[in-house]
């Protein structure tokens, strides 16, 4: 089968560099240049690449390794061209867009922050809601006075109100965390999450010299909001996946 060119990322260098780190299928990667930008590629069979954990991690490792060259724009997993001239055409047609993004993201890192809760955290938030929500307090008083038949439905209504208010409160708390981190970053992006327990999944663009301070701030927020039932998990620095 003919080998194609698998593209990992765009870099702000056209120098023909071979990276020591290996990419997909254990093959070394190199730079195909155009003007003052380049694409980091490696040879792979010209066929659809399976989105397996190993392949995705190999893609991510090469993107991170490419940052040694300079500013990096990650390319979507699975991007393959049949021949080298296909990569050159991509660089030629998209040059202005790539150049603008490379300039914007120079000296920047991406950090990820997830805010989530576990059973203990949810119980803590629910307990706070039961004590502070005027509606819940009112229903609890009504429950104490209600007869057996009415009390059953009142209790169901109260439990649903507690649950709804607890989730609203967690959203409110996660927004406080997000707003704080926004003030400590250059740009932010809210990301999708498929897990109900994750109430915030966000990426933040941070100047490279400010990365340690950003992680320290996220750590302090984690300690502060753990008392309120939320867990804060931070990661990075990464290439700016969410901003290019």
Task: Label the predicted regions.
Residues 1-244:
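An interfacial alpha-helical scaffold signature
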């Amino acid at each position: 089968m003919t080998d194609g060119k698998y593209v990992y990322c765009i870099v702000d260098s056209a120098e023909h560099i071979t990276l020591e780190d290996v990419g997909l299928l254990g093959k070394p990667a190199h730079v195909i240049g155009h003007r003052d930008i380049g694409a980091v590629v490696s040879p792979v069979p010209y066929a659809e690449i399976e989105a397996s954990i190993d392949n995705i991690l190999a893609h991510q490792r090469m993107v991170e390794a490419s940052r040694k060259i300079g500013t990096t724009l990650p390319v979507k997993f699975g991007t393959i061209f049949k021949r080298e001239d296909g990569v050159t055409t991509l660089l030629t047609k998209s040059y202005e867009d790539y150049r603008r993004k490379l300039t914007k993201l120079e000296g920047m890192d991406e950090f990820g922050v997830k805010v989530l809760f576990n059973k203990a955290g949810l119980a803590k938030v629910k307990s706070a809601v039961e004590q502070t929500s005027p509606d819940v307090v009112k229903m609890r008083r009504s429950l104490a006075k209600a007869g057996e038949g009415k009390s059953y439905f009142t209790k169901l209504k109260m439990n649903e109100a507690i649950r709804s208010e607890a989730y609203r409160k967690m959203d409110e708390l996660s927004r406080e965390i997000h707003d704080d981190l926004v003030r400590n970053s250059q740009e932010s992006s809210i990301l999708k999450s498929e897990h109900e327990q994750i109430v915030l999944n966000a990426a933040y663009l941070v100047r490279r010299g400010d990365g340690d301070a950003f992680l320290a701030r996220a750590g302090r927020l984690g300690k502060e909001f753990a008392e309120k039932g939320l867990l804060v998990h931070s990661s990075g620095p990464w290439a700016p996946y969410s901003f290019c």
